[in-house]
């Protein structure tokens, strides 16, 4: 389809309830990573436009928070329905600007919508407490109230789901939002906002501001009207934004980098482990925060796992995400390709064994062959740095304690995976792995009903699940005396 003819393909930002260009009329070109072709333009906005979005959100907060939970829930459900009705259009926009295969893009849109459905239901379950009073003439009541205006900065690797996972709980709780999408993937965000307005959500409640990251960020962090900040991205940037948030003491949620281990024990079902490894490593061409960075395989099945994994990797189809059957799309930009290449070169210089892949693919300069390197060691960059690309590095271990030590030997703590048929070992690994999320005999663990988030340098807070709405609420205690 011709995106230019699609009503959901918006080339204006949504600020203070209006679709508009930047004050200075500047525009930023957006390119398709698969073809390098120009897709379109978005406004290059800055501080002034962001301040208007914040003021509009703050002014509309009273109106939004005083709607009943049932009213907010109904609007969110309409938004959910509209997203699913426009599934193919949204998926094509997403694939065109981000690169992932069309079927993966459809899966992401469905996943994104699931958070809206979930939090539409959670809006009606924001409960408080009545606490037994220590005083005979007093009663203690605890209730929860929306925190206020929320600002969200979202990444390019999941340009739909990372927005709805933040915006849906905010809206459900009664909070207006300002979204700053990644510069590489703004069109998905703008399309989602269009559908939110069609669903009846007031336009001033959800601004989408595109443009200069520094200026937009400065406006957000300087404003006392923005009470909550949420970010998904790299750990270094997350730390910087946390520091900036401290000046106005915002409540902060961060979903940051990872260095996920994927542990395969001798007693594992190898075929199942390889299937799990494929999705945990090569989904979105390895560009996911929960993507496996280190495969830890026990010595008894080490070579068998390598050979089965190699055969599966070599069967993956690389191509433009809009081509039928494509399984591996492009990396997002040349810097991403260079990082993968540097990790491969470093590993091979330190006695790594190249099993398959290792080169830029003939399809185009941003396409990279799924790569498997065996005999990895802790001196390699891949042992400590998140590759964020289609490189699978395999480390060998002998004992369970050694696997735990190797897995936990990182500053990160987002996701970990483990394959074993020993129930006792599965429980021990779940408890001893220092990660916010652990997948036992499963390579795809993300869903809307479970809490998503990490520990250590991988972030603060949880998204999704019944816990995900708490970051958008304040707890208020009231004592009624003289009774």
From Swiss-Prot:
Its EC number is 1.2.1.24. Pfam families: Aldedh (PF00171). The active site is at 255 (proton acceptor), 289 (nucleophile). GO terms for molecular function: succinate-semialdehyde dehydrogenase (NAD+) activity. NAD(+) binds at residues 156-157, 180-183, 233-234, 256, 386. It catalyses: succinate semialdehyde + NAD(+) + H2O = succinate + NADH + 2 H(+). One of its GO terms (cellular component) is cytosol. One of its GO terms (biological process) is gamma-aminobutyric acid catabolic process. It is an enzyme of class 1 (oxidoreductase). Signal peptide: none annotated. Keywords: NAD, Oxidoreductase. PANTHER family: SUCCINATE-SEMIALDEHYDE DEHYDROGENASE, MITOCHONDRIAL. Homotetramer. Belongs to the aldehyde dehydrogenase family. Involved in the degradation of the pyridine ring of trigonelline (TG; N-methylnicotinate) into succinate and methylamine as carbon and nitrogen sources, respectively. Catalyzes the NAD(+)-dependent oxidation of succinate semialdehyde to succinate. This is Succinate semialdehyde dehydrogenase. The lineage of its organism: Bacteria, Pseudomonadati, Pseudomonadota, Gammaproteobacteria, Moraxellales.
């Amino acid at each position: 389809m011709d995106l230019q003819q699609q009503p959901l393909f918006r080339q204006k930002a949504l600020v203070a309830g209006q679709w508009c260009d930047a004050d200075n009329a500047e525009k930023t070109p957006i390119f398709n990573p698969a073809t390098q072709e120009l897709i379109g333009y978005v406004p290059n906005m800055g501080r002034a436009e962001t301040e208007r979005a914040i003021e509009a959100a703050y002014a509309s907060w009273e109106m939004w928070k005083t709607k009943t939970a049932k009213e907010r829930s109904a609007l969110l459900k309409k938004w959910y329905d509209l997203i699913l009705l426009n599934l193919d259009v949204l998926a094509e926009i997403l694939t065109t600007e981000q690169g992932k295969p069309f079927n993966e893009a459809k899966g992401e849109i469905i996943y994104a919508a699931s958070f809206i459905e979930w939090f539409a239901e959670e809006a009606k379950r924001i409960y408080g407490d009545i606490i037994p009073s220590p005083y005979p003439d007093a009663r203690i009541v605890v209730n929860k109230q929306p925190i206020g205006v929320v600002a969200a900065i979202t990444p390019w690797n999941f340009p739909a789901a990372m927005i709805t996972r933040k915006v849906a709980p905010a809206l459900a709780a009664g909070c207006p939002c300002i979204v700053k999408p990644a510069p590489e993937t703004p069109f998905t965000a703008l399309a989602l906002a269009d559908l939110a307005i069609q669903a009846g959500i007031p336009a001033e409640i959800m601004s989408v501001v595109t443009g200069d990251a520094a200026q937009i960020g400065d406006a957000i962090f300087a404003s006392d009207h923005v009470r909550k900040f949420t970010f998904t991205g790299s750990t270094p940037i997350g730390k910087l934004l946390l520091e900036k948030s401290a000046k106005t003491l915002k409540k902060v949620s961060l979903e940051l980098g990872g260095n996920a281990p994927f542990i395969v024990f001798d007693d594992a079902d190898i075929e199942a482990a390889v299937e799990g490894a494929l999705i945990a490593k090569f989904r979105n061409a390895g560009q996911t925060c929960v993507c496996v960075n280190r495969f830890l395989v026990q010595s008894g099945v080490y070579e068998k796992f390598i050979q089965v994994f190699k055969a599966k990797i070599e069967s993956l189809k690389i191509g433009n995400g809009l081509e039928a059957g494509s399984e591996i799309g492009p990396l997002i930009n040349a810097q991403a390709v260079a990082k993968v290449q540097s990790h491969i070169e470093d590993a091979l210089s330190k006695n790594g064994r190249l099993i398959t892949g290792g080169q830029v693919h003939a399809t185009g300069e941003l396409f990279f062959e799924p790569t498997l390197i065996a005999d990895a060691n802790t001196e390699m960059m891949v042992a400590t740095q998140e590759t964020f690309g289609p490189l699978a590095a395999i480390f060998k271990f002998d004992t369970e304690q050694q696997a735990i030590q190797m897995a936990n030997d990182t500053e990160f703590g987002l996701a970990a995976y483990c394959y074993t048929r020993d129930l006792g070992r599965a429980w021990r690994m779940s408890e001893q792995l220092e990660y916010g999320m652990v997948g036992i005999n499963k390579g795809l663990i993300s869903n809307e009903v479970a809490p998503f988030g990490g520990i250590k340098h991988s972030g603060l807070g949880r998204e999704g699940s019944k816990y995900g709405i708490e970051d958008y609420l304040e707890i208020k205690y009231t004592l009624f005396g003289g009774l």
